[in-house]
Curated annotation (Swiss-Prot):
Protein name (Swiss-Prot/TrEMBL): Deoxyhypusine hydroxylase
Cofactor comment text: Binds 2 Fe(2+) ions per subunit.
Known role: Catalyzes the hydroxylation of the N(6)-(4-aminobutyl)-L-lysine intermediate to form hypusine, an essential post-translational modification only found in mature eIF-5A factor.
Reactions catalysed, as given in the entry: [eIF5A protein]-deoxyhypusine + AH2 + O2 = [eIF5A protein]-hypusine + A + H2O
Family note: Belongs to the deoxyhypusine hydroxylase family.
Key words, A-Z: Cytoplasm, Hypusine biosynthesis, Iron, Metal-binding, Monooxygenase, Nucleus, Oxidoreductase, Repeat
Single GO molecular function: deoxyhypusine monooxygenase activity
Keyword Cytoplasm tagged: yes
Chain sites annotated for binding Fe cation 1: 73-74, 106-107
Length: 335
C-alpha cells in the first residue's frame, strides 16, 4: 500500500519531512509541489543509497492519493528513475489499480520497465495481453516487457551504445552504434515504420534524440525535424514520447510542432500536456510564454495543470536558477 502522508517508520529526517509535507499537501500550489518532487527525486536516486533514499521514495509514493493525474504520473516517472527495487511495489500497485488515471498507470508501467527487474514481467505481460485495457496501457506494457528482457539479455552486453548527454533511464535504449556514419533518413524510416515493434521504434527515437544534442551538433536540426514527424503517428503513446523527448532536448526547432500539438483540441490530453511541458523547457525562447498562457483555462485539467508547471519552468529558465527544485537546505538539489 502507498505510505500515508505522515508515515515516518524509518525515522525522522527534517529535509525529507519538509519536502513530503509540501508534496502531499493539496493546499500547496502545484508548481511548488513539483519542485518538492524533483528535490525528493534527487534524494531517491542517490547511488549508493543514503539514509535519505528510502524515506524519499516513501515520500514520493505517499502522494499517489492526490487527485492530480499530472502529479501522479510524474511521481511514477521519478520512481522509475531511482534504480532502486524499493520503488517496485508502489509502482506495481499503481499499474494494477484500474481506478487510477490511465496516464498514471501508463507511467507506472513505463517506470517498471525502466527499473528493469524481472519480477515485474508477469503483471506487465498480463496487462499487455488484456484486450479490455486501454491501448496506451497495453502498448506501454509491451515496451516495458521488451525493455526488461533486453536489460537482462546477452544482447545488451554485446551492444555498443553511443554515450548520451542524458542521464535519464529511458523506455528503450538507443539503437546500437553503426559501424558507419549514422544516417538520419535511415533512422527516421525506422522511427516511422508502424510495422515494427514499438520497442524498436523507440530505439530509433532515442537514437535521433542523441543525434540532436548538443543543439549545435551538425545533425541536431535534421534529427529534430525527423522526430517531429512522429507527432503524426497513429499511436498516442508514441506521440507523447516524441513530445517528452523534445522537452529533454529544448531545441528551438521543435517549437512549431510542439505548439501545433498543444493547440490541437482534438489531440489527446497526454500528448498535449507533454507538449506544454516541453515548451516550458524552452521558456526563454521568444513567444513561448505567450503561447502557454493561452491554455491556462483549457477545458482539460491535465493541460491546465501542465501549463502552470510549464510557466513555472519557463520562469526558472529565464531567471537562470541552478536547479528546478524546492531547496529546504543546501544538501538538496534536483536531478
Amino acid at each position: 500500500m502507498s505510505p500515508s502522508a505522515t508515515d515516518n517508520s524509518d525515522g525522522p529526517d527534517a529535509t525529507v519531512l519538509t519536502l513530503r509535507k509540501v508534496l502531499t499537501s493539496e493546499s500547496e500550489p502545484l508548481a511548488r509541489r513539483f519542485r518538492a518532487l524533483f528535490s525528493l527525486k534527487y534524494l531517491a536516486c542517490q547511488q549508493p543509497a543514503t539514509e535519505k533514499t528510502l524515506p524519499a521514495i516513501q515520500a514520493i509514493a505517499a502522494a499517489f492519493t492526490s487527485p492530480s493525474a499530472l502529479l501522479k504520473h510524474e511521481l511514477a516517472y521519478c520512481l522509475g528513475q531511482t534504480r532502486n527495487p524499493e520503488s517496485v511495489p508502489y509502482l506495481q500497485e499503481v499499474v494494477k489499480d484500474t481506478e487510477q488515471d490511465t496516464m498514471c498507470r501508463h507511467e507506472a508501467a513505463e517506470a517498471l520497465g525502466a527499473l528493469g527487474y524481472e519480477d515485474s514481467l508477469e503483471i506487465l505481460k498480463v496487462l499487455r495481453d488484456n484486450k479490455d485495457e486501454p491501448d496506451v496501457i497495453r502498448e506501454t506494457c509491451d515496451i516495458a516487457v521488451d525493455r526488461i528482457l533486453w536489460e537482462n539479455s546477452e544482447q545488451r552486453k554485446a551492444e555498443k551504445l553511443k554515450a548520451s548527454d542524458f542521464t535519464s533511464i529511458d523506455p528503450a535504449p538507443p539503437l546500437p552504434m553503426a559501424t558507419s556514419e549514422p544516417s538520419i533518413p535511415d533512422i527516421e524510416k525506422r522511427l516511422l515504420d508502424t510495422s515494427l515493434p514499438l520497442f524498436q521504434r523507440y530505439r530509433a527515437m532515442f537514437a535521433l534524440r542523441d543525434l540532436a544534442s548538443p543543439p549545435d551538433l551538425p545533425t541536431a536540426t535534421h534529427a529534430v525535424e525527423a522526430l517531429a514527424k512522429g507527432l503524426k503517428d497513429p499511436s498516442a503513446l508514441f506521440r507523447h514520447e516524441i513530445a517528452f523527448v523534445f522537452g529533454q532536448l529544448s531545441h528551438p526547432a521543435s517549437i512549431p510542432s510542439l505548439t501545433e500539438a498543444l493547440s490541437d483540441q482534438n489531440e489527446v490530453g497526454m500528448v498535449r500536456h507533454e507538449a506544454a511541458e516541453a515548451l516550458g523547457s524552452l521558456g526563454d525562447c521568444e513567444g513561448v510564454e505567450d503561447t502557454l498562457k493561452k491554455f491556462l483555462n483549457d477545458p482539460e485539467q491535465v493541460v491546465r495543470d501542465s501549463v502552470i508547471v510549464a510557466l513555472d519552468m519557463a520562469e526558472y529558465e529565464k531567471n537562470g536558477e541552478i536547479e528546478y527544485a524546492l531547496v529546504p537546505d543546501s544538501g538538496v538539489a534536483a536531478a
